Amino acid sequence: MYLSRNLEQWHAFVEMLRTAFAQGKEQEILTLLLTPDERDSVGLRLQIVAQLLDKSVPQREIQQNLNTSAATITRGSNMIKTMPPEFMAWVKEQLDEQAKKD
């Protein structure tokens, strides 16, 4: 699984997120660290992952629904393939729970 070119920086980032989330400062830390465009990209990636895990919609249709490129959908699909199946099952469960709340 590819994490980062610089694992030390990645681990520092993850640790900062853990600390911020544990202290209820998730909005502030993500706003500080991510530009509006990056936040939009993360939100789009989450939508892509959700639709890919649903498996009822073809990738081309996901691309059209989300008004994004085929390459963006492919990158999401390829990353899913690198993750442990147990983790992806957990992600799907979380997404399904979130969908019930909405």
UniProtKB/Swiss-Prot annotation:
GO terms for biological process: negative regulation of DNA-templated transcription. GO terms for cellular component: cytoplasm. Belongs to the TrpR family. NCBIfam families: TrpR (TIGR01321). This is Trp operon repressor homolog. The gene is trpR. Disulfide bonds: none annotated. Keywords: Cytoplasm, DNA-binding, Repressor, Transcription, Transcription regulation. Residues 59-82 bind DNA.
